[in-house]
Amino acid sequence: MGTKESTQRRAQRVRRQIRKVAGERPRLSVHRTSKNIYVQVIDDAKGHTIAAASTLEKDLKGSLKTGADTAAAAAIGKLIAERATKAGVKEVVFDRGPYIYHGRVKALAEAAREGGLSF
């Protein structure tokens, strides 16, 4: 089994567990690359995105040294918490995807919790 297949299997395993515990809560989905990090609050029942944020946004891009460090992830976590709260979402289910809960993913999650999201 190659790296791509194992990554996809890991992501599917995580999402399967999320579906079991989610209930009516939307999903806070994280995607990271070597240069940026992206996050969305997704309502799977309706099939649409409630809020989104990434390190590619112009107002953040100037203030961050790079989009690929824990400081950038923390800034995105605070921003998504602010946007989700503004949209009326307080509780979410954290979807780390195929990524381990460490480093940038952990920094984003902790900042989102500090910003007011509950998961």
Curated annotation (Swiss-Prot):
Alphabetized Gene3D superfamilies for the sequence: 3.30.420.100
GO cellular component: cytosolic large ribosomal subunit
SUPFAM superfamilies named among the record's database cross-references: Translational machinery components
GO function term, MF aspect, one: structural constituent of ribosome
Keyword rRNA-binding included in the entry's annotation: yes
Coiled-coil portions: none
Keyword list, A-Z: Ribonucleoprotein, Ribosomal protein, RNA-binding, rRNA-binding
Alphabetized CDD domains for the sequence: Ribosomal_L18_L5e (cd00432)
GO terms classed as biological process: translation
Assembly: Part of the 50S ribosomal subunit; part of the 5S rRNA/L5/L18/L25 subcomplex. Contacts the 5S and 23S rRNAs.
Annotated family: Belongs to the universal ribosomal protein uL18 family.
Function, as annotated: This is one of the proteins that bind and probably mediate the attachment of the 5S RNA into the large ribosomal subunit, where it forms part of the central protuberance.
Protein name: Large ribosomal subunit protein uL18
Native organism: Mesorhizobium japonicum (strain LMG 29417 / CECT 9101 / MAFF 303099)
